[in-house]
Amino acid sequence: KFCGAAGTTTGSQHLLEVNGTRILLDCGLYQGHRSESYEVNCCFPHFDPGEIDIVVLSHAHIDHSGNLPNLCKQGFSGNIYATFATRDLCQIMLADSAHIQEQDTEWLNKDRAKDGLPPVQPLYLEEDAERCLRQFISIGYERPMPLCDGVTLTFFDAGHILGAAQVLLEIIDKEDGNKKKRFLFSGDIGRGRNEILRDPVPVPDVDFVLMESTYGGREHELPTGATDAFGEILAEALKRGGKVMIPAFAVERTQQLLYVLNQLFHTGKLRRVPVYVDSPLAVNATEIFRIHPECFNETVYRFLFDENDPFIFEGLHLVRAVTESKRLNDSTHGPCIIISASGMCEAGRIRHHLKNGLGDPKNTVLFVGYCADNTLGRAIRDGRKTVNIFGKPVQVRANIETIDSFSGHADHSELLDWFGRMTGPKKRTWLVHGESTRSDALRDALTDEFGGAVDVAVLGETVTI
């Protein structure tokens, strides 16, 4: 049953019932406007949390993991299976999400009070996130684990973020004459050729596929030129004598940029300037990256032993304290690079840097990731001359640059390549995690190239395999 991320890219939740056991694949937050998000996330209209037996989590991104504390709070008491790195990232990301839930509820209640409506409670608190973590069981890649009667789970590297997995369920269907069925949930698929991570692993002998379609019908810039393009933009920007402000996702993108900067400085392709990572979540995530070399590609793994730490270098400052963050906005501060969350500029310390730095033509804002419609990041990327930050208009005089080749999601061609490398009959495929136009484009391409039955998932629909 498709319970989320059908016709959209957030709120991943897919319910599988086999041999009387109810298995939930992912339990993500739907992300949209505050009031709409709260209404969608507060209850589970497609199932009773207390009747779910097992959760299998593909990766730590909040649109896949973020409603787990609420699920547990509302009665789920079973095990949550994830990779070791995913569990460690969830420890910091779910706590951070709880903090955001409390802030969002505060804003939402102000609006409700104006309309004469009673206040609502946060979806969950930090203690709920902490309790939820006790239900996690960690499994390594490609190590089969019996889940329940007739079902074995195996994780395969998805190459999307640290710890991201494709979920293979090997099923002996006792309601269908003990037939063996291999069901694969893609999770989110990486591009391959990532600066840090291994490529997605082809999964063998697959019968049924539940597949993401985020970038169906859309191609990215080639990842092979990302480092050089990044270095050239930075070199030109630093010549102006200003700051380079980089809005970046705290998990994966920040660490990717740190590794690339380390390479650029190490090879002399970029002159050394101070680099500040101004995001407590990103700082914590970077520490987790260091303890999970099993997720690294061969190049980074070798660098780890030859050069020590791929994410730490001379001139790097990891900023936790608010006072230190505020000092970065001092007008006497010389040329530097500031990496700060959030990537879409909707929250976090990046908004303070933009408020103070957008008006200076010596400064540069460099976007390295996706910005959704109706976000501050999208407005700046699209060239708006005045933006609203903290309720006040801010003139945009800084230089605005964009690199799209750092994307963590496979594009259209890469999704087709991933599907083609997978072996087995692939009797039926369902597409999720994509806007309808993206899913439709990928469905048409898969059908044309590979044949077989390919359907776009419909929210609330139940199918039998």
Roles of regions detected by a PLM:
Residues 1-50, 131-198, 325-333, 337, ...:
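Core dinuclear metal-dependent hydrolase active-site scaffold
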Residues 6-11, 18-78, 82-136, 189-198, ...:
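Pre-active-site segment of Zn-dependent metallo-hydrolases
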Residues 25-27, 52-61, 68, 80-83, ...:
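Active-site neighborhood of phospho(di)ester-bond hydrolases with catalytic His/Asp-centered motifs
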Residues 27-31, 53, 180-186, 192, ...:
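Acidic/glycine-enriched edge-of-secondary-structure segments
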Residues 63, 88, 162, 252, ...:
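Short alpha-helical
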Residues 97-161, 176, 293-333:
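Metallo-beta-lactamase
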Residues 166, 190-278, 364-369, 386-453:
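Cap/insert and terminal regions of metallo-dependent hydrolase folds
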Residues 233-373, 388:
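Hard-cation-handling environments
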